[in-house]
């Protein structure tokens, strides 16, 4: 019976296994050859392939079509990984599987970077392959052994008879799947990863890296949660009276592009940001854990005070599992001091599961796109100026409780290569003409000027209130502009931040202090005396 099962299946199984390694040659960065990988990584690859082959066999009972189906799925992941690496300098990782459903819900945020024609071709090609496989390859039948008889040929009275000849087929297929699963699990326990996506992919290969990352994500995070900085933080014995309002602007794709392109962009596009820096409590370049996207990495690092090194697998999407179980953050800490904690993001509240996650992180309220139905847009998203006006109204209408508002802007999200650029935009942001391949930079700089206008508006209105307040502005990551970077060079990847207070403005300006986004929250709170100093911070704002 075993021979009858394996003889017709062994050729497609082995052909598919070899091709599954061959497809990885298309990856960027390219993994090392299979014979140079750790034995455990090879075991995971063979185990996953065996499991997938068995499942396809059980589903379609067409071995060659099953092989083609698995390889097509693998090829799709390879293409997505390469598109991601091209735009974000990072290959596909296990938490990214969630983005397949997000791409259906929010196609504008994803499909432009994969390519609309590529997506249509992939869908159409898979549909054609599905039809061809089902139409051209016969189902495994009694010719390979009476126990392989198909359902279509089985008499109706034996359809649910455990002694019917089809039962051994599924029993053997299940045994094959189980052997693949056991091999993958056993080898996976010996597969070590460093959580540097490119390095792990090159060293282990695609299947082994994805399996290892998935296994790590399923491990308990209780110890990580207990070690969270805000789980053990202590408030100062004496707090400012009154407590200052705290405004944090997490600005989409914000960085001082003049630093990267000093001779190309007009210096006045960030005039208000320069003014804030000249009066700042602290300012400088900000090291963030994202390039071009993945806002929640920077967002969670600020809220939690935890960098990627501490988060392990959760650094890639902390809202996917870790934050969904609750986590002490700056919001929960400020809430314990009596603050009303609010997050404002003019986009769909369910994106990144923020509607479920943010309350668990200590926010009293999360305000999404529903509050901005009539707001002015710049491009497809709510404009930064309209968002700034909303924040000012919140400050003006707040109750006796001090307010902590964390604002996540959306205007400069992109895709920039889909935006229209007119001659007025060129004159507003450029010192000299740019090559046609750099039109994305013009669109980006236009939104950068709008963000700067919002900052100037906030500064003016906050000063008019004559109430203590502290403003923190930082960029979540640099923008996605691959054609610009290829033509005139790419930035380093750091963004910028500024901390500005109403009570202590330094007319002469202070020297820049570069820091990481995980450290920024400590700097921010320490300057207000709301937190016992963590490390050395040379400046403090006295609101008394």
PLM feature spans:
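Residue-level preference for non-acidic, small/hydrophobic
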Residues: 103, 246-252, 407
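Membrane-interface segments at or immediately adjacent to transmembrane helices
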Residues: 180-250, 259-262, 266
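Short, glycine/acidic-enriched capping/hinge loops at junctions between secondary-structure elements
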Residues: 29-33, 258-262, 418, 484-485
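Short hydrophobic "helix-edge" motifs at membrane interfaces and signal-peptide entry regions
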Residues: 51, 241-243, 465-467
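Helix-boundary/low-complexity linker signature
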Residues: 14, 43, 243, 255-259, ...
């Amino acid at each position: 019976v075993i021979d009858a099962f394996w003889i017709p299946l062994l050729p497609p199984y082995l052909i598919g296994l070899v091709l599954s390694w061959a497809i990885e040659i298309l990856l960027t960065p390219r993994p090392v050859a299979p014979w140079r990988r750790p034995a455990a990584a090879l075991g995971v690859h063979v185990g996953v392939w065996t499991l997938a082959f068995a499942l396809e066999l059980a589903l379609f009972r067409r071995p060659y079509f099953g092989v083609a189906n698995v390889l097509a799925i693998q090829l799709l992941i390879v293409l997505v990984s390469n598109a991601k690496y091209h735009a974000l300098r990072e290959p596909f990782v296990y938490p990214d599987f969630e983005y397949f459903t997000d791409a259906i819900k929010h196609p504008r945020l994803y499909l432009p970077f994969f390519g609309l024609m590529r997506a249509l071709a992939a869908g159409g090609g898979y549909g054609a392959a599905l039809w061809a496989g089902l139409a051209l390859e016969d189902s495994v039948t009694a010719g390979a052994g009476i126990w392989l008889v198909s359902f279509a040929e089985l008499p109706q009275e034996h359809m649910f008879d455990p002694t019917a000849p089809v039962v051994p087929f599924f029993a053997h297929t299940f045994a094959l799947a189980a052997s693949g699963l056991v091999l993958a699990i056993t080898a996976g326990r010996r597969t070590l990863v460093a959580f540097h996506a490119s390095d792990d992919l090159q060293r282990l290969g695609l299947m082994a890296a994805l399996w290892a990352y998935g296994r790590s994500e399923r491990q308990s995070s209780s110890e990580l949660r207990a070690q969270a900085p805000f789980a053990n933080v202590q408030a100062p014995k004496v707090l400012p009276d009154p407590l200052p309002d705290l405004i944090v602007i997490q600005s989409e794709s914000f960085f001082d592009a003049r630093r990267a392109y000093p001779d190309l962009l007009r210096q006045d596009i960030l005039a208000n940001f320069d003014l804030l820096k000249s009066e700042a409590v602290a300012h400088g370049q900000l090291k963030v854990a994202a390039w071009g996207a993945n806002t929640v990495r920077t967002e969670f690092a600020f809220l939690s005070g935890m960098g990627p090194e501490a988060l392990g697998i959760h650094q890639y999407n902390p809202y996917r599992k870790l934050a969904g179980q609750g986590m002490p953050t700056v919001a929960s800490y400020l809430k314990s001091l009596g603050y009303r904690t609010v997050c404002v993001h003019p986009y769909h509240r369910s994106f990144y599961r923020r509607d479920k996650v943010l309350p668990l992180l200590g926010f009293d309220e999360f305000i999404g796109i529903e509050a901005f139905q009539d707001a002015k847009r710049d491009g497809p998203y709510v404009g930064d100026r309209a968002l700034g006006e909303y924040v000012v109204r919140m400050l003006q209408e707040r109750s006796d409780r001090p307010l902590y508002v964390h604002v996540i802007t959306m205007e400069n999200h992109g895709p920039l290569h889909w935006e229209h650029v007119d001659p007025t935009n060129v004159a507003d942001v450029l010192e000299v003409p740019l090559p046609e391949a750099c039109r994305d930079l013009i669109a980006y700089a236009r939104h950068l000027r709008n963000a700067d206008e919002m900052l100037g508006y906030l500064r003016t209105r906050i000063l008019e209130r004559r109430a203590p307040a502290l403003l923190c502005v930082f960029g979540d990551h640099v923008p996605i502009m691959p054609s610009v970077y290829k033509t005139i060079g790419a930035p380093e990847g750091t963004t910028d931040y500024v901390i500005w207070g109403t009570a202590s403005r330094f007319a002469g300006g202070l020297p820049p202090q570069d820091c990481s986004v995980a450290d920024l929250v400590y700097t921010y709170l320490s300057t207000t005396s709301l937190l016992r100093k963590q490390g050395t911070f040379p400046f403090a704002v006295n609101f008394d």
